[in-house]
């Protein structure tokens, strides 16, 4: 095994993956190689790719759903965690905890990442998904991303234009041929927050949408909002809050045409469901997936006590493991919710996490 000759790499056999994901579900991997430096990560990936070995690349485990039967595989654990600051630039290795990146930037008086506080997972995952929350996304501040192309072995920095960021996506999302090694962010050296675009957050801060304010105040407000929705990972193993055992929002907010939006408005009006929350989007109108889920009949906590997988009791868009769920349980619940929204509103929701070895069936 060529990878075993990469100095310092920890190799373990028969590794349960459930504790390494925020959903707390996963198979037992045949073996896992943990890379604590970028050099180790490059060496291992080059060696295993040359061996043509099937791999699972895992870092924070916060936005991935692993099939129950993915057992005969090798996992490469990304655990390089260095964060460096140079002027208004912050560089984070792929395995750094995302919230540590946010905290480090604020400690150096840099604004721009505060709206993304409390998001679980690693820095390397953020450009893959174009992670976002409360009116901000990492594409707003990323300046470049260091990548390893497993097909050629090339290690280089890619521009934001090459990454083709979109709503919760990038060119990196649907392939593991290119692996993120480091991410660089360009932030506000004047210590101002990013413009507060999200109405709920602006209200909590007492500012007008579009205003800037103290980024530490923004972080505090975001953490309060996220905690109230069960969207901050609970670290207490003895008294876990199962509402936090999730991948966050399971579905993205759909962007629809103006004609489809008017149709959804008519359906909601006829059902007495009230005004439809909506936001302008470059290609149409963005709808609130959580609102669609609840108005389609799937309230918080659905399907109720005793279910191994259910919607969070705090946030209808989070599908949660209540302690004993399997991936099959979660995917069945996701399929039921997706089919219900399609039936009521004619809108097909798109899953946000990466699904490995499991498929969300088309209703």
UniProtKB/Swiss-Prot annotation:
Pathway connected to this protein: Cell wall biogenesis; peptidoglycan biosynthesis
Species for this entry: Mycolicibacterium smegmatis (strain ATCC 700084 / mc(2)155)
Keyword match Flavoprotein: yes
Stored PANTHER family: UDP-N-ACETYLENOLPYRUVOYLGLUCOSAMINE REDUCTASE
GO annotation, biological process: cell division; cell wall organization; peptidoglycan biosynthetic process; regulation of cell shape
Stated name of the protein: UDP-N-acetylenolpyruvoylglucosamine reductase
CC cofactor: FAD
Catalytic residue list: 168, 249 (proton donor), 352
EC class of the enzyme, as a word: oxidoreductase
GO MF annotation, one: UDP-N-acetylmuramate dehydrogenase activity
Catalytic activity: UDP-N-acetyl-alpha-D-muramate + NADP(+) = UDP-N-acetyl-3-O-(1-carboxyvinyl)-alpha-D-glucosamine + NADPH + H(+)
GO cellular component, one term: cytosol
């Amino acid at each position: 095994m060529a990878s075993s000759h990469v100095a310092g790499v920890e190799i373990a056999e028969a590794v349960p993956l459930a504790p390494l994901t925020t959903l707390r579900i996963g198979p037992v991997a045949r073996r896992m190689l943990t890379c604590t430096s970028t050099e180790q990560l490059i060496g291992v990936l080059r060696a295993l790719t040359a061996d043509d070995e099937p791999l699972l690349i895992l870092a924070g485990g916060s936005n991935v759903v692993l099939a129950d039967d993915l057992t005969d595989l090798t996992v490469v654990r990304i655990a390089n965690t260095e964060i460096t600051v140079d002027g208004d630039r912050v560089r984070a290795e792929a395995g750094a905890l995302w919230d540590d990146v946010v905290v480090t930037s604020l400690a150096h008086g840099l604004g721009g990442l505060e709206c993304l506080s409390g998001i679980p997972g690693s820095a390397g995952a953020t450009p893959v998904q174009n992670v976002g929350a409360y009116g901000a996304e990492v594409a707003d501040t990323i300046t470049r991303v260091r990548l390893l192309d497993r097909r050629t072995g090339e290690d280089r920095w890619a521009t934001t234009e090459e990454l083709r960021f979109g709503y919760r996506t990038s060119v990196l999302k649907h392939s593991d041929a290119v692996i993120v090694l480091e991410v660089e962010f360009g932030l506000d050296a004047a210590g101002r927050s990013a413009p507060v675009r999200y109405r709920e957050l602006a209200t909590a801060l007492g500012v007008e949408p579009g205003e800037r304010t103290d980024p530490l105040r923004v972080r505090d407000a975001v953490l309060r909002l996220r905690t109230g929705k069960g969207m901050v990972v609970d670290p207490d193993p003895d008294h876990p809050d199962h509402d936090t055992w999730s991948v966050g929002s399971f579905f993205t907010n759909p962007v629809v045409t103006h004609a489809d939006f008017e149709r959804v408005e008519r359906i909601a009006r006829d059902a007495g469901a009230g005004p439809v929350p909506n936001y302008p989007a470059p290609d149409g109108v963005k709808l609130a997936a959580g609102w669609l889920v609840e108005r389609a009949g799937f309230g918080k906590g659905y399907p109720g006590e005793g279910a191994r997988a259910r919607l969070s009791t705090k946030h209808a868009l989070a599908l949660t493991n209540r302690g004993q769920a399997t991936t099959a349980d979660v995917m069945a619940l996701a399929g039921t919710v997706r089919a219900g929204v399609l039936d009521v509103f004619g809108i097909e929701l798109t899953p946000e996490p990466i699904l490995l070895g499991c498929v969300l069936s088309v209703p």
